[in-house]
UniProtKB/Swiss-Prot annotation:
It comes from Mus musculus. This is Coiled-coil domain-containing protein 60. The gene is Ccdc60. Residues 72-99 form a coiled coil. Residues 224-284 are annotated as: Disordered. It comes from the Eukaryota.
Length: 545
């Protein structure tokens, strides 16, 4: 048995106690890391960083110093890269290729296949054509030859392609795209971007217009009610209770108590009016406190008793009436003061206790929210910083690749300019005048997606006026040979689309075109993402248009 030091034991205990305090922060960091992992899942694994580029440049300098040809080394590297890409493409084709059995005796489910699939689909599967989800076969930009009759679907696919390229290349911090369904507008085909300020302004203007158009609520005015003793009575007022006891000498005690106790001397009509008014004004009256209701009940009982006592005294001795009035008034005033003070004290104490409980609950909630916010701020900021640094690294890598490629092209042009050498200074000036910055060579232009697409498009589509507009817009992206888009950027844009937009044939063709010809994203990765979003089988029936 080995003894554990006391410091290690204390560290273990404190770490166990601190686990439950930061459980919420761990959940937030896990969510942020999951988001970043989803975005960086489809990023190229072998990222050439600055250190590798510097090592490569030093190696090239050493090789040139030894005596090896600089351009020969570059050609060998390019040939090796192309060979590796070709081998990878062949492997993917072999994996996706349909390989039927050679002998019919080995096929056990041949009859089932013939019953479920038609002959054309079997021929296409045997030929090695991969059936993509939601993509049409005949009128498709991915097809090797496009028919001249299908102009409308090709125009819609070109509009969706421009919208997708625009969404992939804009700065999302200041700009945003208009809805995808607006890209098929013949006045503005392909859609356009807009600033966030302008969109918010349009929303506020629309809300104001809707508020202006909607009819205002009509106020229902009630007819003025007939004022009676019961309708004008409000028990919460202090003056009504004071008038209960302080009566003038000339007025009788019965008339002074009629404002509280409903008398039997009133006619039946006044009672009906009183009931109607009380029922109509019941929801408008303020809700009385419990102690005030008890106080009113006590006052009413006292008033009834005094009326009974005074009626008996009037029968027996009318001379004692004035004395009884004074005694009763003084006694009632003192009793009302004591009950009012006690009710006020009890109501204030109960209200203070209730307010203290509410304040304690609100403080605990505020403290809990502050703790959650503070624990989540670090994880959110870390995730944002990681995503920004990742994007900056990708931009740097793309720029370095473009600069290296253009530097190689300029070096070749300079090398070929020294055909006949005469004088060093003359040759240098001749090279500087002749060499111009040319973007791309003949092979790169021939293999580019834009020029390949233009060669496939039918003449009817090129003469179609809305199609001319969309082709002019696509020219901006097509002539940019240095366009680089990462797979995670495509998935981030597609995440904001709705399911019916992803399943639309025209939009699906545009997504497939961008994935295969521009981004070069593996098909398996895209299908896995699409299945997690749309929940469809791997092989879906195509739409014949």
């Amino acid at each position: 048995m080995t003894k554990v030091p006391a410091t290690k034991k204390l560290q273990k205990i404190t770490s166990k106690k601190a686990l439950w305090l930061f459980s919420s922060a761990d959940q937030l960091t896990q969510q942020a890391s999951d988001k970043t992992a989803k975005n960086s899942k489809y990023i190229d694994k072998e990222i050439a960083n600055l250190k590798k580029d510097l090592m490569r440049s030093r190696f090239l300098i050493q090789c040139v110093k030894i005596g090896r040809g600089y351009f020969n080394i570059l050609r060998e590297e390019n040939a090796m890269k192309k060979k590796q890409q070709l081998l990878q493409k062949l492997k993917e084709e072999e994996l996706n290729k349909f390989q039927p059995a050679k002998k019919f005796s080995d096929i056990h489910c041949r009859d089932n296949l013939l019953a479920t699939y038609d002959c054309e689909k079997l021929k296409k599967l045997e030929a090695g054509i991969i059936i993509r989800p939601f993509t049409p076969i005949h009128s498709c930009l991915m097809a090797p030859s496009l028919p001249e009759s299908h102009v409308d679907p090709l125009f819609r696919q070109l509009c969706a392609l421009h919208w997708l390229l625009e969404a992939l290349t804009i700065d999302h911090t200041h700009h945003t795209m208009r809805p995808l369904i607006a890209c098929w507008n013949p006045k503005d085909p392909g859609g356009s971007k807009s600033t966030i300020k302008k969109i918010n302004k349009d929303k506020s203007m629309g809300q104001r217009w809707d508020h202006f158009v909607t009819a205002p609520k009509t106020k229902k005015y009630k007819a003025p009610a007939i004022r009676t003793a019961m309708a004008s009575r409000k028990p919460s007022r202090r003056g009504s209770t004071l008038s209960l006891t302080r009566t003038s000498g000339g007025s009788s005690p019965q008339s002074s108590m009629m404002s509280v106790n409903p008398g039997s001397d009133e006619p039946m009509g006044s009672k009906d009016i009183e009931d109607n008014e009380s029922s109509s004004t019941k929801p408008e009256e303020e809700i009385l406190h419990l102690y005030l209701q008890k106080l009113l009940e006590m006052v009413r009982e006292d008033a009834r008793r005094t009326i009974l006592v005074e009626s008996e005294i009037q029968k027996k001795a009318p001379s004692i009436l004035s004395l009884v009035k004074q005694i009763k008034s003084e006694y009632g005033w003192k009793e009302w003061q004591t009950t009012h003070k006690s009710s006020e004290r009890s109501s204030t104490t109960s209200a203070e206790s209730h307010i203290q409980v509410i304040q304690k609950k609100s403080k605990s909630r505020v403290n809990r929210d502050i703790i959650y916010c503070k624990t989540g701020v670090c994880s959110n900021m870390r995730a944002k910083f990681f995503s920004v640094a990742q994007e900056a690294g990708f931009c740097l890598q793309d720029k370095m690749e473009i600069l290296r490629k253009r530097q190689e092209e300029r070096g070749l042009q300079k090398f070929h300019s020294f055909i006949v050498t005469s004088n060093f200074q003359k040759d240098i000036t001749k090279m500087r005048h002749q060499v111009s910055i040319v973007k791309g060579d003949a092979e790169e232009i021939a293999d580019h997606w834009y020029f390949d697409l233009l060669s496939k498009l039918p003449e009817d589509l090129k003469s179609f006026r809305p199609a001319k507009k969309i082709l002019m817009k696509l020219q901006k992206f097509g002539e940019n040979l240095d366009l680089r888009i990462r797979p995670h950027v495509l998935l981030k844009v597609l995440q904001d689309l709705r399911i019916w937009e992803l399943c639309s044939p025209d939009i699906a063709v545009a997504i497939e075109f961008v994935r295969e010809h521009i981004i070069h994203m593996p098909q398996e990765d895209y299908i896995n993402w699409l299945q997690s979003r749309v929940n469809i089988p791997f092989r879906q029936r195509t739409i014949l248009t």
